[in-house]
Amino acid sequence: MASPVQVNPAGTLAQQALASAPEGMLIAPVWRRASAFVLDVLALSLLMHLLTGQRLLLTLADTSYLTGGPRFLASWAFSWALFMTGFWLYWKYTGRAYHRSLGQRAFRIALVHDDGTLLDDHHWGPRARSKLRYLVPVVGWFFAVRDLLRARSPGAEHRTAIDRAHHTVAAVDWSLPSETRIGLG
């Protein structure tokens, strides 16, 4: 029969959650994570804007398309679909190629499992889809602020909701074991 009393190991919840992490692995600071995300969004938005003849961002921001009739509404909806699909593809395939986005690479952030190993290819599609919530105007800001506050909290194991859902940790890349660093792009 199991005892009704359970003895937990010492340490904070964050220390217990990351107990399987390699010794010396550092969690990436929130400011780096936010800056990497902003860099990704600015760079890819600008690239897509230029590739669409400088119309994409103007169409996304123009709410008069909603009242201009079905043709304008379809154009507005297509622009949002193109915008979201572009980001999903970017995060999915840079994750598969480099095990992080280019913004995360610039800020020396690596996304790894709790034990410090690299993510497999099948993790990047769902993770990219989860990050799209931050791009939705107004609602995305709520999710972003909530997750940034969670990522600063030891009680939330210094993880965002996406990290917790996908069992990942955002670590500083130079603090990872050498066999993990070799696999990073």
What are these regions (language model features)?
Residues A2-P22:
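Short, charged cytosolic
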Residues A2-Q6, S35-L51, G183:
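Alpha-helical transmembrane segments of integral membrane proteins, especially early/N-terminal helices
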Residues E23-L26, P70-A77, R127:
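Membrane-water interface of alpha-helical transmembrane segments
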Residues M25-S35, V41, Y90-Q104, L118-G185:
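Juxtamembrane cytosolic face of transmembrane helices
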Residues W31-A36, A74-F83, P126:
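Alpha-helical transmembrane segments of integral membrane proteins
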Residues V41-G53, F83, F87, L135-G140:
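Hydrophobic alpha-helical transmembrane segments in multi-pass membrane proteins
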Residues M48-M84, S153-P154:
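Membrane-helix interface segments in multi-pass membrane proteins
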Residues R105-D115:
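Juxtamembrane inter-helical linkers in multi-pass membrane proteins
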